[in-house]
Amino acid sequence: MASERKELGKIQKCHFGQGGYQDACIGVTFTLGGDSWGVGDFWGAWAIERSDRAKWTEADRITQLGEMVMRLNSLLANAKVSTVDALQGIPVEVTFDGMALESWRVLKEVL
């Protein structure tokens, strides 16, 4: 059974644009890290043209993108910044389950 651990670090890089799986998505890419660790995270949806074989619909994509923008808006508010590029250097607490990223949050307590 994997063990949960928390690490303190910062948002080292972040950008809005193409990213995710083989850069086939549109959204926000984050690089989070500390003294001896680093991890990437991506919030977004497929940017490629939908095929008839896709297991998602245009409505699904629009919903995912809307949810991502609202999540990003909340992150900006918690970090007390107004742009994605201003997130760089913001302190975070990251939770891992074994080696897998489970979640992360802005350390509002130290801002």
List PLM regions with ranges.
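Short beta-rich binding modules
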Residues: M1-L111
